[in-house]
């Protein structure tokens, strides 16, 4: 048995404490893990190991919460981040399970939210959004479910509307090329791009000659 001789709050991390056993520094703990410890208390080696295991789980959970504080993440992204911080694999799996139970890790919800955000702020094709989600480690089932209702024609039109003001003053041929290239970079196919470019041009030049259905080649 080893006796706790001091519990000191860390100066740089007030949410953590230093534990001294038998007059010597032993280890640091999150305050939530050390909440039940008292000076003079005796700890067995088994209890010390339990405390350190709890500390590892708490450290992993706090790191995951910090990572999630910037934006929602896929489970694969969370796992990769914890690995980068040298969290042991068993602790990573325990952390992910805790996040799932708290509703903080759900790939289906993440995929739907990602598609909604992309559609609203940076419209792109169904194919490109699916590719992005797969790059984030999502399973095909979650990806397919999230993008199944994506309308490429509507999103291409929205993307073009957001872009058209930057192309004001251009002649038709240059406008057509720049807008087509922009939409192609957003992942849209030629069959979607062609009518959208004509529509956007005609809407911006209502009193001028229309170019409906003109071949973009």
Identify the residue ranges that each predicted region occupies.
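An alpha-helical, amphipathic repeat domain used for nucleic-acid recognition
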Residues: 1-217
């Amino acid at each position: 048995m080893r006796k706790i001789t001091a519990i000191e709050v860390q100066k740089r991390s007030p949410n953590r404490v230093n534990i001294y056993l038998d007059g010597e520094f032993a280890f640091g703990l999150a305050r939530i893990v050390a909440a039940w410890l008292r000076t003079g208390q005796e700890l067995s080696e088994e209890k010390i190991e339990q405390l350190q295991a709890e500390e590892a789980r708490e450290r992993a959970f706090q790191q995951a919460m910090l990572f999630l504080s910037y934006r929602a993440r896929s489970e694969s992204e969370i796992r990769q981040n914890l690995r980068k911080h040298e969290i042991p694999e068993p602790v990573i799996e325990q952390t992910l399970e805790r996040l799932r139970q708290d509703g903080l890790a759900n790939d289906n919800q993440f995929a739907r939210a990602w598609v909604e955000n992309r559609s609203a702020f940076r419209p792109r094709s169904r194919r490109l959004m699916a590719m992005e989600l797969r790059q984030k480690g999502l399973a095909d089932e979650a990806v397919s479910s999230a993008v199944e209702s994506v309308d490429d024609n509507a999103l291409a039109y929205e993307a073009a509307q957001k872009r058209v003001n930057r192309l004001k003053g251009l002649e038709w041929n240059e406008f057509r090329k720049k807008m087509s290239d922009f939409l192609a970079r957003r992942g849209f196919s030629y069959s979607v791009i062609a009518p959208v470019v004509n529509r956007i041009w005609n809407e911006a030049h209502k009193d001028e000659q229309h170019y409906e259905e003109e071949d973009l080649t």
